[in-house]
Amino acid sequence: MTVQTFIPNGAKAASENTVTQPTHTTDVSIKKLYIETQGCQMNEYDSHRMADLLGDSHGYVLTNNPNEADILLMNTCSIREKAQEKVFSELGRWRKLKEQNPDLVIGVGGCVASQEGDNIQKRAPYVDMIFGPQTLHRLPQMLDQHHAQVEKPKKEKIKLVDISFPDIEKFDFLPEPRVEGFKAFVSIMEGCSKYCSFCVVPYTRGEEVSRPLDDVLAEIAGLAEKGVREISLLGQNVNGYRGETFEGGICTFPELLRLVAEIPGIGRLRYTTSHPLEFSDELIQCYEDLPQMVSHLHLPVQSGSNDVLKAMKRNHTIDVYIDKIAKLRKIRPDMHLSSDFIIGFPGETDENFAETLQFIKDLGFDHSYSFVYSKRPGTPASDLPDTTPEHVKKERLAQVQQVIKQSSIEKTDAMLGKIERVLIEKVSDQDPNILVGTADNTRLVTFVGDASRVGRFAEIEITEIKTLNLVYGELLNLEPDVA
């Protein structure tokens, strides 16, 4: 089996780019869809697919104004504390819109819907449809069912709730993804089987299920044909990917990366989110063998204390994490590293926190998603005694964020005079002679250039540091089109 099996015929060059921008309209005759997305990149991806789905099936176009929408969808996240109350608070505002327009359709999806489906019906009976992350592909059918029973007496109406966990069938029913720009996200697996003591994901998205290899490669090849040059592979535990091959075998995540790198047009590869347990030597080797792999890694660790990691049921030690990063930086010395940190986990002592702070300083993280611990109902950690005062947790969090911010500033400053590989994404909104792109490390890079170069990779020498995430540069070399 080779990757050519999955490449569509007639792949287009970047100059024949067929990028489609999202449609927004003020035409009152067109049916309009508003989606509020909360939480992670998986939810962002799912929301895009909902828009694709309802656009293809029922002709809905996106609007950024909920007041003019015919359908309001909320794609919810349950990671943080009070997530449920945030949902009901927003639904209260939507209720007023429905009182003004009884034909308005309201749907709630995502992880809070999985957890709180029955409760949503009780507390917000004006919600018409409730669906989970694994059943969003059934939205067109649910919408048809809703319209079919609008005139029925209340007691005859069927409750439109589908928060089941079917096999990973939703991708079989989703339309071809629309392309917006030169980057795209591709979901390769759903759920997580790690059962960390603090996490709700296994309960809201189910256990790990991988998409078949041929489906993933075909989707990416199709995106490349439409001009996409950077792919971000998505999953709750993306490096745990075990996709079935056409021949009936199993493809691992490192093997998938090698196959994706063969697809004409794909010049850059990212992925999120990964787990240290499955950050294997085979995966690290990909960074040496595949130039498409960016020198940026998001690898959640959650804490720098072995005691806390044990209580979290992360099943690895700090030394294991440090060893993996050392191997990676031996191959890529310029590797930028980001992570997740939970501060104030039950039982975290002053000594535990000091270990975490020193760990962060030693590894030089570039960015983090760091939060004070939130008790999530139904998780093992919710039963642990939590004696740390809230103000202490917040003080610790502020220290972590300050250390990481300083590290990020230093890493941005270190870019001065260096040559960065940049994907040129657009012409500046402020100046038609300025181009805007993204470096491997996610910094925005601006420089003087012609609009015809948009969609290409270029070598840019960094000449000025403007802000933490914005640098100026000078074009040195324009790479040949990768298609």
Swiss-Prot record:
EC number: 2.8.4.3
Cofactor binding notes: Binds 2 [4Fe-4S] clusters. One cluster is coordinated with 3 cysteines and an exchangeable S-adenosyl-L-methionine.
Catalysed reaction, written as an equation: N(6)-dimethylallyladenosine(37) in tRNA + (sulfur carrier)-SH + AH2 + 2 S-adenosyl-L-methionine = 2-methylsulfanyl-N(6)-dimethylallyladenosine(37) in tRNA + (sulfur carrier)-H + 5'-deoxyadenosine + L-methionine + A + S-adenosyl-L-homocysteine + 2 H(+)
Domain spans labelled MTTase N-terminal: 31-148
Origin superkingdom: Bacteria
Pfam assignment, any one: UPF0004
Name of the top EC class for this enzyme: transferase
TRAM domain mapped to chain residues: 413-477
GO molecular function annotations of the record: 4 iron, 4 sulfur cluster binding; metal ion binding; N6-isopentenyladenosine methylthiotransferase activity
Key word Cytoplasm present: yes
Cofactors named for this entry: [4Fe-4S] cluster
Chain sites annotated for binding [4Fe-4S] cluster 2: C192, C196, C199
Entry's localization field: Cytoplasm
List of residues binding [4Fe-4S] cluster 1: C40, C77, C111
Major site of localization recorded for this protein: cytoplasm
Signal peptide (residue range): none
UniProt family annotation: Belongs to the methylthiotransferase family. MiaB subfamily.
Quaternary structure, from the entry: Monomer.
Function: Catalyzes the methylthiolation of N6-(dimethylallyl)adenosine (i(6)A), leading to the formation of 2-methylthio-N6-(dimethylallyl)adenosine (ms(2)i(6)A) at position 37 in tRNAs that read codons beginning with uridine.
UniProt name for this protein: tRNA-2-methylthio-N(6)-dimethylallyladenosine synthase
Species: Acinetobacter baumannii (strain SDF)
Gene from which this protein is expressed: miaB
